[in-house]
Amino acid sequence: MKNGLKWALAALARRLLNIGHRKVYHMKLIIAYIQPERLNAVKQALYEREVYKMSVSNALGCGQQKGYLHQYRGAIEEVTLLKKIRLAIAVNDDYVEKTVEGIVAGARTGDIGDGKIFVLPMDDCIRIRTGERGPEAIG
């Protein structure tokens, strides 16, 4: 029993000592919502800054634009959710500013509804094919 207790305590101590020793990566997830017609300009601006990898999806949203009235078959309806494009770009810390600058350069018209950019911390990234983790997985 004594050896069993020692073994259990040693296992618990090993587990506790490993807490907080997870590798810390310096990466960010940049999420941007832009006008659909500005997508090509944003992609071009990002390519010029050597940012080539991104996920693009359709989104609906509202903000200061507030929407508009639309008439369809004689009925007037208020459209409050407007079409947007959502970009998700995972970058290493040294690419954050150039990525944000590229999005702003391509998306800005000066009008309400140009969009928003969110920069979020990202704990990890795993390339499924190779198992690479962290900055190496982003590429």
Per-region residue spans from a language model:
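Positively charged, small/polar-rich N-terminal and surface patches that mediate targeting and assembly
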Residues: K2-G139
